[in-house]
Curated annotation (Swiss-Prot):
Positions bound to NADP(+): E81, G128, A129, G130, G131, A132, N150, R151, T152, I153, E154, K155, I211, G234
One GO MF term: shikimate 3-dehydrogenase (NADP+) activity
Protein name: Shikimate dehydrogenase (NADP(+))
Subunit annotation: Homodimer.
Protein function: Involved in the biosynthesis of the chorismate, which leads to the biosynthesis of aromatic amino acids. Catalyzes the reversible NADPH linked reduction of 3-dehydroshikimate (DHSA) to yield shikimate (SA).
Species assigned in the record: Pyrococcus furiosus (strain ATCC 43587 / DSM 3638 / JCM 8422 / Vc1)
């Protein structure tokens, strides 16, 4: 029951009405008996005032999603080492008025992959060098060989200081053959029938993960299934990164099975 002691959390982005994060986090608050609520904040412009509002209203923490994962940094008081290194934030913790930025995208992707396959020492190809792509590449480069392809090659090349190879999307056929794991870290496929990877480049046994979760079964994942690949939908990464955000805010380990279950139920209701 909402009362004067209820703590507020949320997600900032544009758009965020589609977000599954409120469904998952509110289920966790209920499970752990935490007097808190998680709501979407659609910020069409003026991110600075929105972040100032987090402080002014004593909002305990927010997730940050597209298009603000990089822009939000200049309005925060402190960054985790990972966020500092890659220039991306998706989780903000309000520590008594001090806003600290973290990134949980990378650990979310890594844990999702580890659920299905061996990650240590693998050859991993990531498409996209935006906020999520950078975070995923940085985290996975700690234990694997990582290549990032991007339309703007300069953005991919900036990751080379972490031992990551950056190249153009035009090199896709060569690197797909090299890869054990392929990750789409772009928004291509979100609410559209598009795939950056043609079906003929895929092969049996290749692990294919898409960070897009609307639709859950993207065109890329359908291609992967048809070619005998191991297909991992974007909801797995979402629940694992959400569980890590929940831990940063509350100190509790998020229940990924519960998070996925309530998210799937919500998606089914809206088909």
């Amino acid at each position: 029951m909402i009362n004067g002691e209820t703590k507020i959390y949320g997600i900032i982005g544009n758009p965020v009405k589609h977000s599954l994060s409120p469904i998952m986090h509110n289920a966790l608050f209920k499970k752990f008996g935490i007097n808190a609520i998680y709501v979407p904040f659609e910020v069409k412009k003026d991110l600075k005032n929105a972040i100032n509002g987090v402080k002014a209203l004593d909002i305990q923490g927010v997730n940050v999603t597209m298009p603000y994962k990089e822009e939000v940094i200049k309005f925060l008081d402190e960054l985790s080492e990972d966020s500092q290194n890659i220039g991306s934030v998706n989780t903000v913790v309000n520590l008594e008025g001090k806003l600290v930025g973290y990134t949980t995208d990378g650990i979310g992707a890594r844990r999702a992959l580890e659920r299905f396959t061996q990650v240590d020492g693998a050859n991993i190809l990531i498409l996209g060098a935006g906020g999520a792509g950078k975070a995923i590449a940085y985290e996975l480069s700690k234990v694997a060989n990582v290549v990032v392809l991007n339309r703007t090659i300069e953005k991919a090349k900036r990751l080379e200081k972490f031992g990551i190879v950056g190249d153009s999307l035009e090199a896709l056929p060569y690197y797909v053959e090299w890869a054990d794991i392929l990750i789409n870290a772009t928004s291509v496929g979100m609410n559209e029938e598009k795939s950056l990877v043609p079906k003929n480049l895929l092969r049996p046994g290749l692990v294919v993960m898409d960070i897009v979760y609307k639709p859950l079964n993207t065109l890329l994942l359908r291609y992967a299934q048809e070619k005998g690949c191991i297909a991992i939908d974007g909801l797995w990464m979402l629940v694992y990164q959400g569980a890590e955000s929940f831990r940063l805010w509350t100190g509790e380990e998020g229940d990924v099975e519960l998070m996925r279950r309530v998210a799937l139920a919500w998606l089914r209701e809206r088909k």
